[in-house]
A protein has these predicted regions:
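Phosphate-group recognition and catalysis centered on beta-loop-alpha active-site segments
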Residues: 1-212
Length: 212
């Protein structure tokens, strides 16, 4: 489903600007809006379920990652953000659980992303073939970041929109790593990122990301 010639239209938490985030309704809206991919958030619950929520899920939350993957399969790629409490152990367990599920499903259009290196490592151990992306919202040393990307065999970097630069995109591509920016809602910024060669743009209003 990846077209190297076009910028990916990625719906942030589905189509957050139009429908309640991280719901089947929102993912269906993203599909209606012509998204190539959706981003969603997953937590490992105490009972072992993988629950969909941006914040730590409450007792009434029931939507699971399995259900989202089933809905999206063959229609939308899925960027699964691995969420965790402030604990590397918990992050690694979450990554391991999601990595195991994705490896078992062998879904080529699903991958993981996280702020937590431990979560990405947990996924790598449980599902070595599952693609992984590192999320950041700061300005890390570029050479160190690329070295880490190579060492972790990352598929992509996911910088916050504030930290996207032409130099970052160029360095990532030279390393063999894609760049998917978040969360980009302003048309002028979307146009600028396209000019810089960003591979994917996550947006609350994904219809604003041109398809050609």
């Amino acid at each position: 489903m990846w077209d190297a010639r076009a910028v990916r239209r990625i719906g942030h938490r589905g189509a957050k600007g139009h429908s309640p985030e991280n719901t089947i309704e929102s993912f269906a809206k993203a599909l209606e809006l012509g998204c190539d991919e959706i981003e969603t958030d997953v937590w490992l619950a105490d009972d072992g379920r993988l629950l969909i929520s941006h914040d730590r899920p409450g007792p009434d939350l029931k939507l699971t990652l399995q259900e989202v993957l089933d809905f999206c399969r063959g229609k939308l790629a899925v960027n699964v953000e691995l969420k965790s409490e402030m604990s590397e152990k918990a992050a690694q367990e979450t990554g391991g659980s999601v990595g195991k599920l994705l490896a078992e499903r062998r879904d080529p259009d699903a991958y993981v992303s996280s702020f937590w290196w431990a979560a990405l490592e947990g996924c790598r151990v449980a599902g070595p073939a599952v693609r992984r992306a590192f999320i950041f919202a700061d300005s890390p040393d570029r050479s160190s970041l690329m070295e880490s990307a190579r060492g972790m065999r990352l598929w992509a970097l996911h910088p916050n929109r504030t930290y996207v630069t032409p130099e970052l995109v160029k360095a990532a591509h030279a390393t063999g790593v894609k760049v998917n920016a978040w969360t980009v809602n302003e048309p002028r910024e979307i146009a600028r990122f396209r000019e810089w060669g960003v591979d994917g743009i996550m947006s609350d209003f994904p219809e604003r990301v041109p398809k050609d």
